[in-house]
Amino acid sequence: MKVIEKIQEAAADGRTVFSFEYFPPKTEEGLDNLFERMDRMVAHGPNFCDITWGAGGSTADLTLEIANRMQNMVCVETMMHLTCTNMPVEKIDDALTTIKSNGIQNVLALRGDPPHGQDKFVQVAGGFACALDLVQHIRAKYGDYFGITVAGYPEAHPDAIQSTEGATPEAYSNDLAYLKQKVDAGADLIITQLFYDTDIFLKFVNDCRQIGITCPIVPGIMPINNYKGFLRMTGFCKTKIPAEITAALEPIKDNEEAVKAYGIHLGTEMCKKILATGIKTLHLYTLNMEKSALGILMNLGLIEESKISRSLPWRPPTNVFRVKEDVRPIFWANRPKSYISRTLGWDQYPHGRWGDSRNPSYGALTDYQFTRPRGRGKKLQEEWAVPVKSVEDINERFMNFCQGKLTSSPWSELDGLQPETKIIDDQLVKINQKGFLTINSQPAVNGERSDSTSVGWGGPGGYVYQKAYLEFFCSKEKLDQLIEKSKAFPSLTYIAVNKDGESFSNIPTNAVNAVTWGVFPGKEIVQPTVVDSASFMVWKDEAFEIWSKGWACLFPEGDSSREILDKVQKSYFLVSLVDNDYINGDLFAAFKEI
């Protein structure tokens, strides 16, 4: 979806929205850290996020890779910067074609900084001289597909500022006229360069309106994180620093925490003044850090740390090809990125109902599904590379996770227990102690308010429902006992399968069971998660593979722990268990005498 359309929707609803900017890190570790941070920040619901192109066009390939992952794995509406620096038109078209094929619809068109080693911008052979040329090219070749954003400079472009007094009236006027040319050529949104004098920004907005620029103008807010970085950035951008800011920073400039605290306070006050004028969109330059940006938003009341709203139980996709998707099998609830990667390229995505899962084919398992960020890999190494001498040791690892003693699991891309799991964590601990090793679960919910902090989704005003669900590994002996006990509980349905495909079930092979649904004003029933027998047989390969590629691999070759884990992998069954009585049922009753 185009960012301009999202901004217009928010304006029509009277909502204030915000967005974040990131830049490509220089190291693989930095990239892993960025995506972990981005996942946390995106949970707060930014309107979009953008990724920079890099000084002198130095990060072109990395920017394309990051933009793709942001749009399709992080599931946030993504705007990619695109500059003219070192970019002949063929390269520009390659970049645009790539992001279009990846479902990205938003571009920030810039001239770009001078190439490395040069003081002034140099037009590359076969390339463009300015952002206006780039905007014209995008509109001419790609029509209305892309939403195009351009940069606005409240104090004029740095190249137009020749003295410490700022741009001359003529230079400022010329810069505004050029901005209007970019908008007239097809840009539909303006994001400003950083500023610290709010009055300068508000004057800039008014001046734009006076010359006929009518599109939204979004203020770019850069929190002050450290004193030296602040001086470097404002010097590079030739940004005016009000005397009161200089006076406030001088006595604390060597105290980094005090500078950050002041930066949050200053950013908050700037945003309050801007919002008071009726502007409803804020863009935060994060510098790949989260605390200051989130601190400002919390101070403004735009986010709450303890209350993160969800439009669905899983983060909805933003890729233009799958934006209507609203139904998924529950099996990948803790591995959403793996699910996305295995369903890329489907011609259609389920909307309204799951339908026939045998129609689209899931992608084959690859190393991608088992790679993990360095930080998560390190945490798994610390928490799960504990010697395994018996099956009881395995049970203890799973119990510790359910008790919150561990914050990672080989079967989850998420951090720790999810809020709804904590409702049933005592029962989960008990069945894990008995050898039913849980990897996915949800409690029964009967008409809980949709804004509940533990089980809510879909926004305020609705009610949500869930059938109790468990997914676990267990031995054949335990499975036989459970199947026998379940005969006394007619509301229980199950599917069980081992690594080799031997299976047991009390439901048809093509059965689809909605296990989560919501009722909202003026809408049809929404049922975002299902138990689908056919998809479970696809998921089981991935679930069993994690025993070796997610856990056993943490131990050295030849380690006895690997042997025990291998035996469990080859002999245990994966079980999906649903209690269809979400009003009076008790999913855990069948386990009590086992």
Curated annotation (Swiss-Prot):
Active site residues per record: E21 (proton donor/acceptor)
Biological or metabolic pathway of the protein: One-carbon metabolism; tetrahydrofolate interconversion
Binding site for FAD: T52, W53, H81, R111, G112, D113, Y153, H157, P158, D159, A160, D175, K182
EC number: 1.5.1.54
Cofactor: FAD
Keyword Flavoprotein applies: yes
Residue positions binding NAD(+): E21, Y22, F23, P24, P25, K26, T52, W53
Source organism superkingdom: Eukaryota
Residues holding substrate: D113, Q193, Y285
Alphabetically ordered keywords of this record: FAD, Flavoprotein, NAD, Oxidoreductase
Coiled-coil regions, chain positions: none
Enzyme class, broadest EC rank: oxidoreductase
Reactions accelerated catalytically: (6S)-5-methyl-5,6,7,8-tetrahydrofolate + NAD(+) = (6R)-5,10-methylene-5,6,7,8-tetrahydrofolate + NADH + H(+)
Molecular function terms from GO: FAD binding; methylenetetrahydrofolate reductase (NAD(P)H) activity; methylenetetrahydrofolate reductase (NADH) activity
Oxidoreductase listed as a keyword: yes
Regulation affecting activity: Plant MTHFRs strongly prefer NADH over NADPH. Not inhibited by methionine or S-adenosylmethionine.
GO biological process: methionine biosynthetic process; tetrahydrofolate interconversion
Quaternary data: Homodimer.
Family: Belongs to the methylenetetrahydrofolate reductase family.
Function: The probable reversibility of the MTHFR reaction in plants suggests that they can metabolize the methyl group of 5,10-methylenetetrahydrofolate to serine, sugars and starch.
Protein name: Probable methylenetetrahydrofolate reductase (NADH)
Organism in which the protein naturally occurs: Oryza sativa subsp. japonica (Rice)
